[in-house]
């Protein structure tokens, strides 16, 4: 009865299953676990016009929300397509944003502090409107009287402000448009060193009758995975909705297309966003005002996440302001938490959040001391191993005792042959005599598994790892080792661990145990270097612990034999 090997075999088999499942998904086939395969449309971009603009549909312009007075839907806005469009490029110390004067919409966002790769000086392009990616932020006003339309994200605006670069602490980018008796002044306020943009919509009634407008804030994105997405480990790309009532909710593009996504529809708090590995965008309306959230498919492989808020009645000659925040940037948990409640939850650790968050806090504290994320991973692994040393010691002592009685166990198997009942009785008697717990080598490992899985997700999800060097050849801990040195070291440490364990009496099982390092090491060839570094350090410390404990037990046994 070797429970530990059974557990290892289960882990090995499940890992192979996950590897095959990811390969199936990568090749567009259904998941083995019942999830949808990637959409066939995911490789197709939304159709674009001659200017590279994604084709519009009437579905991309909302009707008034239920909270607003009854009003007709905005007519299909194909007419503005003929208007001359001006692209306005605004630069801060951390962002380069491109706005289209048609709709005063954000059509490109470059993150100047985040290179696209460790081999490139070009900034990461998070949002764009091109043949490769459609990902934009839009706003507009609906609820116009019958036959009229208010300015939407397809209405021509004109630029009022003149500054294009941030020279002080803030920069205002101002657009204006008037339609249907409503003048809309849209102001984007950018801040030095920040990824949140203040957005104000000032609405003035220039007509002779009261108006009841409603403002929508929306993000549009195609369903393709971000560049560099790995087939060997999964990260979420899709929509996120947060509210105090239902907390953090994720919705895949596939569920939006099938109209089966679960999210809060009516709320007076929270935000909507689009999440991908390391980065996110989000609209955060003013809290305390009722709004309607909508997730929908605009056209093939193009999806919208929007929130619509009734402004209230604006009398002739009067005006109203609606403020919101737009986040465009990395998943920086500290900065996001300062912008809106729950925004930092885009870094989603799932059911292990209760363990992962303290680990991340400890990791950031260690980085403040060490100044290098690679050495931070090493130090964090050492601390975790130290905390679990008593459990590990119990496990290794149990394995060492099992190794000592292995010859006697083999003799019992030869004596009783196929008589399983007598063999098990004899084994249990031997375990009682030698004070060995067959589960002693397994249970301490099981207790540690949630912590190690949580640490895995912390290292995988943390944008701090992106572009972070360690030493010598490791220039980016978020990508695979370019020379595969760390995976080779990991395989070597796994072989050493197997050699330190009792040899399985079953030859087939022994061969399987020797194959495991090759399989896991092969998988690590495609994993981020930071994760492989963690496993290398963890295995090395485990070997040192196991060797020390085994040697001590052997000395104790030798001393007892000499007495």
UniProtKB/Swiss-Prot annotation:
Its main location: membrane. Residues 36-70 are annotated as: Disordered. One of its GO terms (molecular function) is membrane insertase activity. One of its GO terms (biological process) is protein transport. Signal peptide: none annotated. Keywords: Cell inner membrane, Cell membrane, Chaperone, Membrane, Protein transport, Transmembrane, Transmembrane helix, Transport. Pfam families: 60KD_IMP, YidC_periplas. The keyword Electron transport does not apply. One of its GO terms (cellular component) is plasma membrane. Gene3D superfamilies: 2.70.98.90. The chain crosses the membrane at residues 6-26, 373-393, 443-463, 482-502, 512-532. It is a multi-pass membrane protein. Residues 54-70 have a biased composition (Low complexity). The keyword Ligase does not apply. InterPro entries: Membr_insert_YidC (IPR019998), Membr_insert_YidC_N (IPR028053), YidC/ALB3/OXA1/COX18 (IPR001708), YidC/Oxa/ALB_C (IPR028055), YidC_ALB_C (IPR047196), YidC_periplasmic_sf (IPR038221). It is found in: Cell inner membrane. Belongs to the OXA1/ALB3/YidC family. Type 1 subfamily. Required for the insertion and/or proper folding and/or complex formation of integral membrane proteins into the membrane. Involved in integration of membrane proteins that insert both dependently and independently of the Sec translocase complex, as well as at least some lipoproteins. Aids folding of multispanning membrane proteins. Interacts with the Sec translocase complex via SecD. Specifically interacts with transmembrane segments of nascent integral membrane proteins during membrane integration. PANTHER family: CYTOCHROME C OXIDASE ASSEMBLY PROTEIN COX18, MITOCHONDRIAL (PTHR12428:SF65), OXA1 (PTHR12428). This is Membrane protein insertase YidC.
